[in-house]
Curated annotation (Swiss-Prot):
Pfam families: Ycf4. The chain crosses the membrane at residues 21-43, 58-80. It is a multi-pass membrane protein. It is found in: Plastid, Chloroplast thylakoid membrane. Its main location: plastid. This is Photosystem I assembly protein Ycf4. The lineage of its organism: Eukaryota, Viridiplantae, Streptophyta, Embryophyta, Tracheophyta. Keywords: Chloroplast, Membrane, Photosynthesis, Plastid, Thylakoid, Transmembrane, Transmembrane helix. GO terms for biological process: photosynthesis. GO terms for cellular component: chloroplast thylakoid membrane; photosystem I.
Length: 184
């Protein structure tokens, strides 16, 4: 979502609450539970899951490895679940021409630094850029180049926008901030 007036522009940034993350957390926990139950069945010597016979799985080494994979998968699944519930990465980019500031806000993990807020002056921005990498792990990222050649990324790596949409976003932002554009 984007809101814009003559002086202020606000862009919402989606966090971890995506359908794909819900899907992968569910699949990961379900599969890891299967591994853990089959490994535990091989230790106990009886089937904990009626559909998955475990008599042919020896506890050492296969059962131990399956238990390890199950515990690791459940841990990663819960990590992903907590990231979804805390909505890690959610936030906004605020561009205020009237006050001459740019504010980037994101939610992080709970703790002392849960709120991540970066604020700087517009006069320190040299250009708006677009970094494009095509291939198997393609990525398209809009960034701001600051004085001193530091890049500050404004979009997620996982944002699935077409090249034309990303070029338009970068051009509109550069036009709004009255800076040059690079990388297109």
């Amino acid at each position: 979502m984007k809101r814009q007036s003559e002086w202020i522009r606000v862009e919402s940034i989606r966090g971890a609450r995506r359908i794909s993350n819900f899907f992968w957390a569910f699949i990961l926990i379900l599969g890891a539970l299967g591994f853990l139950l089959v490994g535990s069945s091989s230790y106990l010597g009886r089937d904990l899951i009626p559909l998955l016979p475990s008599q042919q799985i020896v506890f050492i080494p296969q059962g131990i490895v399956m238990c390890f994979y199950g515990i690791a998968g459940i841990s990663i699944g819960f990590y992903l679940g907590f990231a979804i519930s805390w909505d890690i990465g959610n936030g906004y980019n605020l561009f205020d021409k009237q006050r001459g500031i740019v504010r980037i806000f994101r939610w992080g993990f709970p703790g002392e630094n849960r709120r991540i807020c970066i604020q700087f002056f517009m006069k320190d921005i040299q250009a708006i850029g677009l970094e494009i990498r095509e291939g198997f792990y393609s990525r398209r990222i809009i960034y701001m180049r600051m004085k001193g050649q530091q890049k500050i990324f404004l979009t997620h790596i996982s944002e699935n926008s077409t090249l034309k949409e990303m070029e338009e976003k970068a051009a509109n932002l550069a036009r709004f901030m009255c800076v040059s554009i690079e990388g297109i």
